[in-house]
């Protein structure tokens, strides 16, 4: 398991916003700062649990998402928000945790470039 980012929900606007209409949210590029912070503003009607929309989460890359989810309380089922990435959210001790499986043979380019491909 490898650290990927910290997602912090906010209702405020922030510099370098990236709109992700297919996800009903706006984010910052977590790769553009040394601490992996990703600001996240969820749009009205975004189809996510309140826990994810209101509580910060930590995200980890895993080699095998299915194995990592075994025995966990899954709150967002595995899905592919962008090319080469499959994610799921679990609930651990009352907090959301994001798990990502990344196909490095597909996942090339910057965070912003890859998300723009999915629009």
Segments from the language model and where they lie:
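Vicinal oxygen chelate
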Residues: 1-32, 36-50, 73-119
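Short hydrophobic/aromatic beta-strand micro-patches
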Residues: 7-9, 59-63
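Short active-site oxyanion
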Residues: 55-57
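Beta-hairpin (beta-strand-turn-beta-strand) motif
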Residues: 61-65, 102-104
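Short amphipathic alpha-helices within nucleic acid-binding modules
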Residues: 65-72
């Amino acid at each position: 398991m490898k650290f990927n980012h910290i997602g912090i929900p906010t209702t405020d606007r922030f510099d370098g916003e990236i709109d992700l209409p297919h996800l009903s949210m706006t984010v910052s590029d977590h790769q553009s700062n040394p601490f992996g912070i990703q600001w996240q503003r969820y749009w009205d009607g975004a189809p996510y649990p309140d826990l994810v929309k209101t509580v910060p989460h930590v995200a980890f890359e895993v080699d095998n998402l299915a194995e990592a989810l075994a025995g966990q309380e899954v709150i967002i089922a595995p899905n592919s928000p962008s090319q080469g990435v499959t994610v799921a959210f679990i609930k651990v001790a009352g907090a959301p945790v994001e798990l990502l499986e990344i196909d490095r043979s597909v996942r090339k380019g910057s965070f912003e470039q890859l998300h723009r491909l999915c629009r």
